[in-house]
Amino acid sequence: MDYTNKVVAITGGARGIGLAMAQAFHARGAQIALADLDGAEAAAQAFDGLGMTMDVTVEGQVAEFVQKTEAALGPIDVYVSNAGVLMTDEPSWDAAGATDANWQLAFEVNLMGAVRGARHAWPGMRERGGGIFVIVASAAGLLAQIGAAPYTATKHAAVAFAESLSIAHGDDGLQVVCVCPQGVRTAMLGDSEDGGIAGVDGIVEPSAVAQVTLTAIEEKTFFALPHPNVADYETMRAGQRDRWLGGMRKFRRKIMSERGRPI
C-alpha cells in the first residue's frame, strides 16, 4: 500500500512498538505525528514530523494532538492508539491485589486512551469518507496475562472496543485493526531475558509487530497477530474453557515455583 503523504498519528510513539510503527509507515511515504509522555519531539525529528508531549488519560490533550496534527500535516488518515501500561497484581499477587489507583490507571491508558483517540480522530475521518484506526492491544486481551489482572481486563476491554468500532463504523469507511502480540522486546518486558510468561512463544522485535500490522491493513483483516499461535489459543479458550483455565492454573503454579512470583 502506498502511504505517500498520508498522515499517521501515533500515541506512545517515542519508543518501542509506536516508534517501530512510525518507521514502517514513514518508509512507505507517510507523514508522521508522534505523541508520548516524553521524547516525542526528539523522535519525530527523524521523520521531519510532529512531536507532542501528551498524556492519553487527559481528554483535552488527546483532542489537542489531533488538532495540532491536522493543522501541521493535514487530515489524519491512520490513527494508531499504541500507548499502554502494564499493571500487575502486586503486592499480594491476588487477582484483586492491585490498588484502585493502579486499576484506574490501567483503565485510563489501555482502554480510554483508545476511546478518546477515536472520539477525536474518527469524526474527521467520517467526513472524509473513512480512515484506519489501529488499536495495539495484547494477546492478554484475548487470553490472560498471569499475575496482571488489571492489564488483562483492560486489554480485553480494548479488544472489545476495537470490535465495537468496526461494527458501528465499518460501513462508514473505518477500517479497524487490533494488534495482539505476546512478548515484544520493549521496556515493558523489564530486565527479563526470556520475557517471562509473555515470552513463552518467543520474543519478537517491535519492527515485526509493525510489519504484521501493515500486512493486516493491506489484507483488511481485523486482527494483527505477530505470534500466530495466539489464534489457536483463543480457539481453545473459547471451545474448551475449563481445560484452558486448568492449563493456565498449572502454568501459574510452574512459574510461581520457579520464580516465587507469577510475573
Model-identified regions with their sequence ranges:
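Substrate-binding pocket helix/loop in short-chain dehydrogenase/reductase
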Residues: 90-104
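Active-site-adjacent segment of SDR/Rossmann-fold oxidoreductases
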Residues: 143, 164-175
